[in-house]
């Protein structure tokens, strides 16, 4: 039985909204699916707006969090906040409970356009965060000098322009925005197989999805490698450091290891959130079209919209200064996220205090401070090694010792003989000048 579109085509504002014929081939999904989807999207929207709203409030009101690197987190939180507000609750939630898109064709295009902008913005902002953290870990001594508020602002402007570039194409005929899945939300048209739609999908996949994936993988792979190398260097230096320096080095290594674990979580969350969309779009273009059912098309929507919840948890709650700020302002938020005392102590030990006279543009992040402290200790050890031998030490003359010295077979085998008593304590070596005579004794008489 074909799908009854009377409950899924909108008759408000614009009755000519386009529904791709592909979706007519499937039966209408049960009401329970609509209601479950509406509840899920509503919960994601409310939590996404609340969580990202708290992140934006704290990062803008807490001076210690207003560093250049944290501008990316604020931009990500703003992107996810808007994504949850417009593309989740209430538009899609209302449509799911009514079992049809009720907001018309123009609203469908605006909905898809906003979803495209902030979807691409979240992906590219995560790539910018990975670049910043790669600079902090891979080049810690130069990280605080290179990243400033101006540089971070320029990178964020690039992210916005990049996102608008890919989202605006369907508005002007390069692809299209249309209903998808259970016909309660709008997105890119990935079902049509004409050349315009296919080129749009391929370009978005390669440059809008796969490109940021390569950036994120490259940066976090090098972060993990840097963590491994620093741990080996710290182990080699441990014996030469005093107790205070060793404690700071161990704290920095612990902070690095936590950062590496967070990096793995970030990559996994990124793939979990956005890979299903990419797979379904490519499958619709190059695979069996009958595999793209309403259920298969709606699952990526759920994963992508849930990413607005993951991001503030991963990028913000893992930040030690953010945890401190949120515990003072909203202590109830962290009741489910307990951090042991050792982790908090390591974070404090690993951070370097910023002098009051420094400009806020050059203020390093906590990660940069940790790495600068470790690199300073490593440079100190390298300077000590470079200062040996001491200045003024004359090297031995060329050709010394002479070739063939000592002679082969020297000392002779069995020398000294077994049982040979050692010389008495204080005895002068053979050939040494005679000792001075006691006080009051004539030297010639003493030697005679």
Curated annotation (Swiss-Prot):
Residues 359-391 have a biased composition (Low complexity). PROSITE patterns: G_PROTEIN_RECEP_F1_1 (PS00237), G_PROTEIN_RECEP_F1_2 (PS50262), OPSIN (PS00238). Disulfide bonds join 108-186. This is Rhodopsin. Keywords: Cell membrane, Cell projection, Chromophore, Disulfide bond, G-protein coupled receptor, Glycoprotein, Lipoprotein, Membrane, Palmitate, Phosphoprotein, Photoreceptor protein, Receptor, Retinal protein, Sensory transduction, Transducer, Transmembrane, Transmembrane helix, Vision. Contains one covalently linked retinal chromophore. Upon light absorption, the covalently bound 11-cis-retinal is converted to all-trans-retinal. After hydrolysis of the Schiff base and release of the covalently bound all-trans-retinal, active rhodopsin is regenerated by binding of a fresh molecule of 11-cis-retinal. The keyword Glycoprotein applies. Residues 59-70, 132-151, 225-261, 316-448 are cytoplasmic. Coiled coil: none annotated. GO terms for biological process: phototransduction; visual perception. GO terms for cellular component: cell projection; membrane; plasma membrane. It is found in: Cell projection, Rhabdomere membrane. Retina, rhabdomere membrane of photoreceptor cells (at protein level). The modification N6-(retinylidene)lysine is found at residue 305. Residues 2-33, 98-109, 173-199, 284-293 are extracellular. The gene is RHO. Belongs to the G-protein coupled receptor 1 family. Opsin subfamily. Pfam families: 7tm_1 (PF00001), XYPPX (PF02162). InterPro entries: GPCR_opsins, GPCR_Rhodpsn, GPCR_Rhodpsn_7TM, Opsin, Retinal_BS, XYPPX. The chain crosses the membrane at residues 34-58, 71-97, 110-131, 152-172, 200-224, 262-283, 294-315. Residues 343-352 have a biased composition (Acidic residues). It is a multi-pass membrane protein. Its main location: membrane. A lipid is attached at residues 336-337 (S-palmitoyl cysteine). Residues 343-448 are annotated as: Disordered.
């Amino acid at each position: 039985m074909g799908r009854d579109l009377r409950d899924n085509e909108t008759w408000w504002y614009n009755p000519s909204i386009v529904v791709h014929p592909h979706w007519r081939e499937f039966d209408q999904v049960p009401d329970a699916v609509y209601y479950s989807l509406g509840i899920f999207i509503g919960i994601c929207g409310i939590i996404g707006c609340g969580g990202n709203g708290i992140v934006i409030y704290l990062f803008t009101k807490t001076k210690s969090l207003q560093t250049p690197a944290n501008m990316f987190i604020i931009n990500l939180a703003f992107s996810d906040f808007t994504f949850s507000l417009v593309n989740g609750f209430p538009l899609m939630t209302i449509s799911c409970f009514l079992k049809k898109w009720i907001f018309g064709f123009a609203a469908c295009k605006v909905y898809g356009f906003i979803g495209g902008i902030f979807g691409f913005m979240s992906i590219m902002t995560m790539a910018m965060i990975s670049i910043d953290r790669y600079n902090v870990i891979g080049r810690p001594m130069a990280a605080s000098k290179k990243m400033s508020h101006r540089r971070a602002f320029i990178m964020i402007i690039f992210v916005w322009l990049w996102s608008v570039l890919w989202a605006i194409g369907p508005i002007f005929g390069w692809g299209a925005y249309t209903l998808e899945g259970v016909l309660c939300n709008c997105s890119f048209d990935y079902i049509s197989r004409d050349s315009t739609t296919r080129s749009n999908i391929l370009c978005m996949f390669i440059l809008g999805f796969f490109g940021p994936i390569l950036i994120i993988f490259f940066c976090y792979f090098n972060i993990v490698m840097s963590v491994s190398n620093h741990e080996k260097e710290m182990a080699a230096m441990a014996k030469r450091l005093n107790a205070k320096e060793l404690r700071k080095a161990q704290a920095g290594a612990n902070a690095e290891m936590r950062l590496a674990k967070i990096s793995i979580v970030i990559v996994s969350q990124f793939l979990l959130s956005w890979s299903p969309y990419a797979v379904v779009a490519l499958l619709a273009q190059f695979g069996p079209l009958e595999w793209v059912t309403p259920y298969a098309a709606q699952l990526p929507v759920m994963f992508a919209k849930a990413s607005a919840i993951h991001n503030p948890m991963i990028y913000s709650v893992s930040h030690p200064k953010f945890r401190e700020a949120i515990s003072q302002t909203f202590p109830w938020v962290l009741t489910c996220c307990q951090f042991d005392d050792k982790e908090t102590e390591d974070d404090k030990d690993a951070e370097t205090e910023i002098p009051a006279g420094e400009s806020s543009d050059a203020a390093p992040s906590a990660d940069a401070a940790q790495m600068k402290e470790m690199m300073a200790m490593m440079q100190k050890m390298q300077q000590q090694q470079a200062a040996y031998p001491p200045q003024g030490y004359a090297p031995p003359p060329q050709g010394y010792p002479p070739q063939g010295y000592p002679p082969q077979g020297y000392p002779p085998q069995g020398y000294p003989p077994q049982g040979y008593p050692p010389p008495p304590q204080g005895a002068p070596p053979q050939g040494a000048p005679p000792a001075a005579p006691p006080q009051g004794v004539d030297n010639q008489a003493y030697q005679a």
